[in-house]
Amino acid sequence: MKKLKIIPILFATAFLAGCNNINPSSSSISSPSSNSSSATSGTTASSNATSNSTTDSATSTSSSSSPSSISSSSTSSSTPTIEEGVSKYSHFQSISNKSRQAGFLPSLGNPNILVIPVDFSDYTFVEAGAKSNEAARERIEDAYFGERNDDELHESLRSYYKKSSYGQLDITGVVTPVIRAPRTYAYYKSITNSSTQTDLIDGIIRLALKTLDSTYDYHDFDTNGDNIIDAIWLVYSGPIDNGGNSMFWAFTYWSYMEDKFDGVDVSPYAWAAYKFFDEGGYTDHPDAHTTIHETGHLMGLDDYYDYDGYRTPAGGLDMMDNNIGDHMAFNKYNLGWVKPETITESGTYTLKPLTSSTDCFIIAPKSYNDSEFWEYYIVEYYRPDGLNKLDATTKYSNLKMFTVNGLRVYHVNQKMGYLVYNQRKNSYVWNNSYISDLDSADFESEDKYPYIINSNTSSYSYNTKKDTTLVSLISAAGRTNTQDGKNSDIFTEGTSYDSKNLTWEDGESMNFSFSVTSVTDYSLTFTF
């Protein structure tokens, strides 16, 4: 029996597409095995034409006194040196690549992505509000690769990720001439079957890459040498339609076309409307919230809202939840931008703000395998500044980031286990055991393979304990199953947490507590 590789088919944006409007049946996580591919970025594009056809990881210093006093001392004061046109996967991405057999936009270095504007004979970029195709391309260029000053709040994709990664990720790329889709907007809108939709988008990608073949060498968009285009972005001119099963919203997918272009494959791509740039109503720059969120998916990050619509375990206030703010420490750990210190003893601990430093700590069970793929608490000093400032100041999709300084705490359960083929169900089920040593895990077996077991969407989780989530906000106010994060969820000076009678999933007693003793604009101190 040939092994069925599975990856999430559609990663949707939380804004406008809306988790309550997403049909879970069109977002299944099964897809056939095929060649993999991945996405990247480059420089700028030229003419207008329409086609027919870590920083250093955080370090801790213990004093000789007891209890220990530990300060996380890493900051982003110096920008790492990035080799132009060279990128690489984080550890999380490398393992995920083996698990899903799919490419990702590398999260470290200088990936090069291909941004393709797509219009329709019955809905052009002029009808979408641009003065011309060239004007549309210039606006797309600004949204993706525009330079921003430190005091500007309306980030481009590139400027956001340079700041969020502390200079460890510099996404560059080209915006190509406009490509005319082979069918009308009305035709595509009439298609409601998700498999047909992605086949049609494959057709648009195929047409675009063939049309542009004499203009670009697609090897330039494979910066990590895996023979996969780092990433493709399709920006379509048609209106957003987030109702029912329309394809005209924003999502990320992995193509399985067998075509090669200059010898490289196509794998991750994102699809979103030009109209998303209007959502914030900004006059100085396009709104890039949706672009930034979907690019997180291109790098392998999951959605943290619930597609079933029952809950929002992570509280809604993160770039991978409701498209707002900076990435939380968990995301940065996955993408290789921070290396959290693990708390192993009682003491006093100090953090600098995550917006300006790589400081964060992990609280974990004895079984912790020193990787992203386990169960742990991850703690960070949250401040409503830097990449959090815009969304802490103004609402986006009726939500605002936390507006207070304090300790933000998440519980993570990103363990991997073997999925085993069940012939009766014609699907894969979890064998109820976890893999602690992923470096020696079997990714080649025909009848089982490692996969992340938990999800924030119950129907996507392989864990029969449906209350076990991938990542959840630990509320200082004691709220559970949070829908929208509130300031009271942040641990401010004088607040504390006690794990009481809680246990880790393996049955080990948590048996820890912490108290926030000091919060300034520059640091936060807590006792453990």
Describe the residue ranges of each PLM region.
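Bacterial N-terminal signal peptides that target proteins for export
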Residues: M1-I7
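A generic structural micro-environment signature
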Residues: I7, T124-V126, Y307, D326
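Short, linear, compositionally biased motifs with a strong N-terminal bias
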Residues: L10-T13
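Zymogen propeptides/activation segments of proteases
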Residues: N20-N23, S76-N224, D230, Y236-G243, ...
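Ser/Thr/Gly/Pro-rich low-complexity, disordered linker/stalk segments of secreted
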Residues: I22-E83
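Extracellular hydrolytic enzyme modules, especially secreted metalloproteases
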Residues: A231-N398, K415
